[in-house]
Structure formats: structure tokens, C-alpha cells
């Protein structure tokens, strides 16, 4: 049996060793997980687990991000297309109003330069 007076000596001996080993034990799972993730690959980890549920959640999260990104790109393309259309219309209106053709007028609803006599589109 161990005597009570030996307990403090035992604690003084093993406590520093335990404290030195704790960081190594703490880092071992992280090193094992990062070893499976190679450079250049996309590694997604949710909570550090490799169970099928966390993989499915990561897949769904990635899929949702991809869909959001795709929609964002569509919206940006639409805005850019509308801006270009309006920009061309402003240039066409300026050209129509500065035209030497006295019968040319700008139709704001259709955003075209038309001939007053025939109603046909003209290029000033």
C-alpha cells in the first residue's frame, strides 16, 4: 500500500510529465486528419469527423454554395447585359438627335430612331 505522505511526491513526479505529453495527445488526431488532405485538393471537414453524416453535410453545403454562386453570376450577367443595352440606347438617341436628317426622331418606347414620314427605322 502507498502511504499518504508519498502522494505529493508522486504528483510532483508525474504531473510535469503529464503536462508535457498533453499537447502531443491533443495534436495527434489533427495531424492524422490533415495527412489525408493533400495539397491542391479540396478538403472539407465538419467538426473533424470522418463519418458519413458529416460528409453528406459538407457535400450539401458545397452544393448550396455552388448554386448560390451560379445564381449570383446569372444576376451579374443580366445586370451587365441591361446596362450595355441602355448604354447603346443612349448613344443611339444622341446620334438620332444630332442627325442631319430632319425627318429623324427618337421613339422612347422602342428606343429606336424612326423616320417621321414612313415610320421606319433609320440609321443616322
Swiss-Prot record:
<feature type="signal peptide">
    <location>
        <begin position="1"/>
        <end position="32"/>
    </location>
</feature>
<dbReference type="InterPro" id="IPR009700">
    <property type="entry name" value="DUF1283"/>
</dbReference>
<comment type="similarity">
    <text>Belongs to the UPF0482 family.</text>
</comment>
<protein>
    <recommendedName>
        <fullName>UPF0482 protein YPTB2194</fullName>
    </recommendedName>
</protein>
<keyword id="KW-0732">Signal</keyword>
<dbReference type="Pfam" id="PF06932">
    <property type="entry name" value="DUF1283"/>
</dbReference>
<feature type="region of interest" description="Disordered">
    <location>
        <begin position="47"/>
        <end position="68"/>
    </location>
</feature>
